[in-house]
Amino acid sequence: MAESTSSGIKRVLSIQSHVVHGYVGNKVATYPLQLLGFDVDPLNSVQFSNHTGYKTFKGPVSNEKELATIFEGLEENELLPLYSHLLTGYIGNPLFLRQVGHIVKKLRQANPGLVYVCDPVMGDNGQLYVPKELLPVYRDEIIPLADILTPNQYEVELLTEKEVRSEAAVWEAMDWFHKRGIKTVVISSSDLGQPGVLRAFLSQVNGPRLAIDIPKQGGKDLVFTGTGDLFASLFLAHSHDSKDMASVFEKTIASLQAVIKRTVAALPNGGNGPVKAAERELKLVQSKTEIEQPQVLLKAQRLN
């Protein structure tokens, strides 16, 4: 029998995308988790040459049968009790996502203390980039299984089927998720801050309601890919090590902003002007120190 998590092992099964070049999905999640003391077993939902923000991308998309086969191998070798966490990100196939639901249940049978962190990657800035058929699977089958949810503002609107255009609407949405069994919900970014400022929110059942204002970096039209994936992995790590949600939230944002700052600094003209997709890849490896030792500059505001 494989050693169980009762011995203090920190191991993540991470089911999301993989790219050969660049940093999104498992490529951006694995390194920070390892730096913060976790073993990571990446299971790829797709394997692309690069992320989809380039002019072209190539590579295969995994299906639910391939996922089931790989997981079966883990199960037959009695490895399931080793996992302390499940992390899921980009999944583009509704049947693949449904299979993830079966995986959550099997992992919980092997380790009732498993923590499931779900990043429901579906779109951003009003643009849906997965098949709409994923929505009911997330809403009805996956969301109720999650312990921690890390959507962006647009994904919150997709899941709740309500616009989120005010802070009152944010807390209504948070309550919608809590009623479905999710203990901790973090909206990783929203446009509800002042001009030039993103606003992130956190809500925990019987816990604090928090917000952090995050100044945008670089040119006004500069967009980075993989930041949500990085956010989810950092939040997973810090929430395991501390139950102080304000501190967890602050450290997550601190490391994320440090990575973005280093990335912007490497851009031509600081990102003011045209920037190629390859130039916008996150400077992850170069940010090792900021990931291991986050310097908190942006403090959480308690709103309850």
Positions of predicted regions on the chain:
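Conserved phosphate/ATP/ADP-binding segment of small-molecule kinases
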Residues: 129-211, 218-220, 241-246
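Short glycine/threonine-rich catalytic loop with a Thr-x-Gly-x-Asp
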Residues: 214-235
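Glycine-rich, highly charged phosphate/nucleotide-binding loops
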Residues: 58-76
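A short helix->loop->beta-strand "cap" motif at the edges of active sites that frequently abuts
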Residues: 107-116, 180-183
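Short glycine/serine- and small hydrophobic-enriched flexible loop segments
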Residues: 233-241, 254, 258
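N-terminal glycine-rich phosphate/adenylate-binding segment common to multiple enzyme folds
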Residues: 80-108, 120-124
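Charged C-terminal helix
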Residues: 246-304
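Glycine-rich phosphate/adenosyl-contacting loop at the front of the ribokinase-like
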Residues: 1-62, 291-304
